[in-house]
Swiss-Prot record:
Rv0183 represents a suitable and promising drug target. Optimum temperature is 55 degrees Celsius. The activity increases 3-fold in a linear fashion from 25 to 50 degrees Celsius before decreasing slowly at higher temperatures. One of its GO terms (molecular function) is monoacylglycerol lipase activity. This is Monoacylglycerol lipase.
Amino acid sequence: MTTTRTERNFAGIGDVRIVYDVWTPDTAPQAVVVLAHGLGEHARRYDHVAQRLGAAGLVTYALDHRGHGRSGGKRVLVRDISEYTADFDTLVGIATREYPGCKRIVLGHSMGGGIVFAYGVERPDNYDLMVLSAPAVAAQDLVSPVVAVAAKLLGVVVPGLPVQELDFTAISRDPEVVQAYNTDPLVHHGRVPAGIGRALLQVGETMPRRAPALTAPLLVLHGTDDRLIPIEGSRRLVECVGSADVQLKEYPGLYHEVFNEPERNQVLDDVVAWLTERL
């Protein structure tokens, strides 16, 4: 089965140009996936994911978040999670109009997982299935209370202020993945800015209260050796959601990007199998 990728764009809030890709299989689609990538990266790092989904008969839509990759806006600059969820909602709307009647799957990794979670509790009628990979739903656990308070304040006043350095070697045990990430011109290699820190704290601090609104089937993927987003947040998430069909798939020894680990094919097979059972 052949999957074709096309690039498009739309005007997001504030008239920011949002670039997105669509991966279309050459057969009638079984469902539509709308994907949100993580902090600092871009949609095309998920080309192999979309190709695997395409082989299963799924159309995939994936945007470069504002301030990321090919999209417009100041680099990784945001003040509120709603800026991301609004763009994501626009893309879900496009996918829904272009494939009416198809089930909608929302998929997010890391920061994108936090975005998809926030979107899911706000718009529970806009999707049918949710898949989260190492979701950033407990950012408050990653910093001290003092740093959290500072990030929430600075995120409003100086949202572009770099506040947190990341260890990029922690994304994958595959050295080729790390090298490609470090040399990718579309990837932001700087520190996490205060605005994004504030946005993710918004998600994490409200997660236990808002998670019961998630009632659709949910699959959460997480490597047990993830040093960037520890697995404990995912374990708490699955205990809080309102869905009767929820599964946390823990991958022993895997790092942050389970889709880019040496075991990536098994992870993708697990995702496709889970989705296929529910379509």
